[in-house]
Curated annotation (Swiss-Prot):
It catalyses: N(6)-methyl-AMP + H2O + H(+) = IMP + methylamine. This is N6-Methyl-AMP deaminase. GO terms for molecular function: metal ion binding; N6-methyl-AMP deaminase activity. Gene3D superfamilies: Metal-dependent hydrolases. The active site is at residue 210. Keywords: Hydrolase, Metal-binding, Nucleotide metabolism, Zinc. Zn(2+) binds at residues 23, 25, 207, 292. Catalyzes the hydrolysis of the free cytosolic methylated adenosine nucleotide N(6)-methyl-AMP (N6-mAMP) to produce inositol monophosphate (IMP) and methylamine. Is required for the catabolism of cytosolic N6-mAMP, which is derived from the degradation of mRNA containing N6-methylated adenine (m6A). It comes from the Eukaryota. The gene is Mapda. Coiled coil: none annotated. Belongs to the metallo-dependent hydrolases superfamily. Adenosine and AMP deaminases family. Its cofactor is Zn(2+). The record marks 231 as: Important for catalytic activity.
């Protein structure tokens, strides 16, 4: 079964389903329409669509995926670019029925345009603010990402930025993400800044166990007791030490952000039916369906829910509960959770009635 395959009559249910998106990288979420605008602004780069998106039925290695992000970064080099991208991405998630979104992105500096890490962050926040002023039906927050390639020095600078904006943005900046090429850098380099962030009250969403044979690193990052885990693909593998990590994650009920199409197209998981969502869902572990990079992987959250439901034979009520329970794992405050639950409850009958007409 390929991502993008349509099931006639069922699509409305997944689109109308209210959803929470907790693992979405800003630059990886740029749609083809926004990408065309960026490419038109920089024709000298000679970038084409296939260099920034993996089409239906195609796959790349994880390393090739990270190379694609380098191409995308060449297109988003100014504060104006970041503002436009942020607004477009938010609007597209809203159009897909996402009611709460935590966007993550690494603050970057670009000497050629004068963009600093701080103005990068300010551009993301301005995009969030403008979408709110336009009364879009979506609540958006921001997680600052530490890219492993930057090393410990830039990690510390990012933590300082996050602390500054955490205090000044009225709960818009909520936490930190550790991401980037998992083969670069040592986890030990990031423990101190991440711990400092945690002490300051910032939440931690850490990419963890994306690739095999990283038991020692996984243990180090788990020692921080992250608030959520991104991917966790090889936590459930039967390699030495991995079983202990599964038990640790289960005992501490650390929610997992699971991105099916991303893992298939980057070839860290061989097929949808072998995706580790099946294992974690079967033991009722806190799990959230996410897109990761909806632009690069040519997907959207409604489609990811549909893929999970079709692959693992979930009933419409199980799909609803999966979405509803994801509210528990957001980084915003209890009041926000309460408001979201009210919205879900208000929409429930309408969405499930739509399902009764179209699903079977």
């Amino acid at each position: 079964m390929e991502a993008g395959q349509q099931w006639p009559g069922k699509t409305d249910f997944y689109l109308q389903l209210p959803k929470v998106e907790l693992h979405a990288h800003l630059n990886g979420s740029i749609s083809s329409s926004t990408m065309k605008k960026l490419i038109a602004k920089k024709p000298h780069l000679n970038v084409h669509g296939h260099m920034t998106m993996i089409d239906k039925g195609k796959k790349r290695t994880l390393q090739e995926c990270f190379q694609m992000f380098q191409v995308i970064h060449q297109l988003t080099t100014s504060a104006e670019d970041i503002l436009m991208v942020t607004k477009d991405v938010i609007k597209e998630f809203a159009d897909d029925g996402v009611k709460y979104l935590e966007l993550r992105s690494t603050p970057r500096e670009e000497n050629a345009t004068g963009m600093t890490r701080k103005t990068y962050v300010e551009s993301v926040l301005e995009g969030i603010k403008q979408c709110k002023q336009e009364n879009l039906d979506i609540d958006v927050r921001y997680l600052m990402a530490i890219d492993r390639r930057g090393g410990p020095t830039i990690a510390r600078e990012t933590v300082e930025l996050a602390k500054e904006f955490f205090l000044s943005t009225e709960n818009t900046v909520l936490g930190l993400d550790l991401s980037g090429d998992p083969t670069i850098g040592q986890a030990n380099d990031f423990l101190e800044p991440l711990l400092e962030a945690k002490k300051a009250g910032l939440k931690l969403a850490l990419h963890l166990a994306e690739i095999p044979n990283r038991e020692k690193e996984n243990q180090m990052l788990l020692s921080l007791l992250p608030d959520r885990i991104g991917h966790g693909t090889f936590l459930s593998a039967s390699e030495a030490g991995a079983l202990d990590q599964v038990d640790f994650v289960r005992q501490h009920q650390i929610p997992l952000e699971l991105c099916l199409t991303s893992n298939i197209k980057s070839q860290t998981v061989p097929s949808y039916d072998q995706h580790h969502f099946g294992f974690w869902y079967s033991i009722a572990h806190p799990s959230v369906i996410c897109t990761d990079d909806k632009g690069v992987f040519a997907t959207y959250l409604s489609q990811e829910y549909q893929l999970a439901a079709e692959t693992f034979n979930l009933t419409p009520f199980q799909v609803w509960d999966l979405s509803y329970e994801s509210i528990n794992y957001i980084f915003a405050c209890d009041n926000t959770r309460s408001e979201l639950r009210k919205r879900w409850t208000h929409l429930k009958q309408k969405v499930l009635n739509c399902n009764e007409v179209n699903y079977f």
